[in-house]
Amino acid sequence: MQRFMFSRVVEHQRQISRGFLSLVPSLSPTAVPAMSRFFPKITASDSTSSIPFFTPDFINPKKTLEESLNNLEGLTCNQAEREMYLFPQINQQRLLNTTGSRFGQVLGTWQFRCTILPARVNRVREVHETSNNEKKQQKQKSSVNEKKPKKKKKSSISDIPRRTKFQKHHRGRINKGVSSQGYICSRYALQTLEPAWITSRQIEAGRRAMTRNIGRGLTVRVHIFADKPVTVRPPETRMGRGKGAPAFWVAVVKPGKIIYEMGGVSEKVAREAISIAASKLPAKTKFIISK
């Protein structure tokens, strides 16, 4: 069918339609044979008929035809086919490349056999299987994204060191000495009274409890950092086969060490916030006010 439609176009390419000539106004009484350089297949019967006379010097057939075909949306297929016969060199590219055509306006395809041009074919064209598959994939992706758990917000400070010289440390002993770093920069502070190992999670839990109670705009200083890895082996394992894998990080704290400090609030608010932070720690502590 496609070859047949193209053969019809080739056969009628050199023929002239009276409808096209009727679009051109008569400008002078010159005979039609003067157009022989544009239309070499014109016959003598056409020159003696009642077609209006005009000269080729005052008319641009390409421009005239384009002005008459500015709006192609309302044309039917029969009219479009007739316009192809009138001036194929102009209308062929226009009809094939009209916006709204998915596969191109090729003669013999289902789009060209439709009763309207491609600008309106988009509204009534068939639903392809590919579009259905794409919709299914989008639904599956959306359902997967909904099931994903929400990511936890990162804390303002790092809980563990980013890089260490050695991956595993010796366990060591808990010293009973007194800390020499007991200075305070702010008004209120929390001081330890016994040696302990404070994990990174406990340090972060105490800091968050203080910041929530004192409100925004005020800072809480943390004087300790969990820099020692603690290894743990699974239960009921035999002797040997190396040291266990690092399980958590701790900060070694001696008596008299300052853990948190803050300022800019009243004593009542500071005491309440620090008491909540002290309940998160595994060691005995006391509330300090600097003079």
From Swiss-Prot:
Transit peptide endpoints, chain numbering: 1-27
Compositional bias segments (type: Basic residues): 163-173
Biased composition (Basic and acidic residues): 127-137
Ribonucleoprotein as UniProt keyword: yes
Region forming the signal peptide: none
Protein function: Could be a component of the large subunit of mitochondrial ribosome.
Family designation: Belongs to the universal ribosomal protein uL16 family.
Name of this protein: Putative ribosomal protein uL16-like, mitochondrial
